[in-house]
Amino acid sequence: MMKYTKLTAVASMVLLYGCAAPSNIKPTNQLADQTILEHSQNLRDSQLTPAVWPAQDWWVVLNDRQLENLIDLALKNSPDMQLANASLKNASAMVMAADAQFDPSVSADASLSRARLSRSQDYSFQGHRYGTIYNLGLSGSYSFDLWGGERDAWEGAVNNQRAAQVDHQAARITLSTAIVQSYVQLANAYALQDLAQKDLDRTNRIVDITSRLLKHGLTSEDRLYTAQSGAAAAKQTLKKRELAVSQLKNAIATLVGQGPDLASTIHRPSAHIDTELALPRELPANLLAHRPDIVAAKWRVEASSKEIDSAKTRFYPNVNLSATAGFKAMLGDAVFGEPSQAWSVQPAISLPLFTTGLKANLIEKTAGYDSAVAQYNKTLVNALGEVSDNILAMQSIEMQLDDAHQSMNLADKSYHITEKRYEAGMGSQLEVLMAEQQLIQAESSFTLLKNQQQEQQVLLVRSLGGGFYQAPEAKQAATSSSTH
């Protein structure tokens, strides 16, 4: 009785020691306070026109069928989307693998073995005997998830799958906004090309007029050289503008996932972007639900939290049940007979005693959680900075456009006054062409600023999530607090 009591005490101590997960291994990083968005002075004080959040297919409002077709083609064929699809499939497979841990393992076995017995193996010590053994049966095992470790691992895999689903939508948003941005640049490149052609025509007329004046001895030869130099420079500028158009077409074709053949079919854009600065009334309170990168980062924090829970259960005892049933016989015609029936049931309990490997695994999962939290905090702060930068940039461009528009109007008035003076015989055609140069330069500056404003509008759409929105029930799950 005394020995039994001692053995029980020792076994209990070993059991308690083995079940103790290290309490000093725990995360150090904490999730950033989400109210940082609500307290943003820059966003709260912005003078903006209230609007709705971008729709999922927000580019449709641009009324450019060619652009819509390019984006549709890109979403189907782009390597970026193919990578996102592959990542999503991989995450789904991990969920399937984790889900399989809840099911019992069952396998069918069938074997036939023939052997020659040695004299020492033969009970009659004759040797030279042959035997054939037939084996047919089922075997299975089931591990009881007493501590919820498999459940935690499954939930972690599901959260990673949700993050991959959001990443898939983020890839869609990134690709579509990149195409629209390049498309806007292409539209403005065509406008600058038109102005370059207009300037080349102007300089050619100056060369023609100067040549005629020189022929009649009304000007000097250096004036002709100056005019020809201006024409050559204008021609060079036009070639640069034409190159920019071709390069942007190639860039769009690359984003779509096609080659140069597609670039040659892209026509001049007809899209018009509303450049009025407008943001939703709910900004920044609802920004978390509209930014896919923030949502995906939060799902990964939740996944890492569950992985820690699962790692802790590895320190506890594990109960496993194994069973086999089937037939074993030495005669083929007696395999399915009652004497050949065989079965076994084997319950087992296992307890880790040397836990260095388990501690290393827990440290790894804890470090993964800290990394996921740091990434979430970084994403949250970057989102705030991105929206703020876009607002500041658009407000600055808006003020610059006022000045550029005024400059263009004044240059236009000067041009028309000079033109009327020439028509009245009070000025020369060269004066008209010089005034036209000022107008073209002002128009070019205005076009460049307009391009920046339109690009910034596209970037603003992307910073607002590009049409992404997390459902309320998913948002509630993603924002659940971790208890590590």
Each language-model region and where it sits:
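Terminal intrinsically disordered/low-complexity segments used for targeting and assembly
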Residues: 2-76, 158, 242-289, 331, ...
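Short flexible linkers and secondary-structure junctions
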Residues: 20-178, 319-323, 353-360
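Small/polar, glycine/serine/threonine/aspartate-rich low-complexity segments that form flexible
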Residues: 53-62, 72, 111-139, 262-280, ...
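Sec/SRP-type N-terminal targeting helices
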Residues: 83, 99, 144-172, 222, ...
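Periplasmic alpha-helical coiled-coil/stalk elements that build and connect Gram-negative outer-membrane
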Residues: 159, 166-283, 393, 397, ...
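A short glycine-centered flexible hinge/capping loop motif at secondary-structure junctions
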Residues: 214-218, 422-426, 463-465
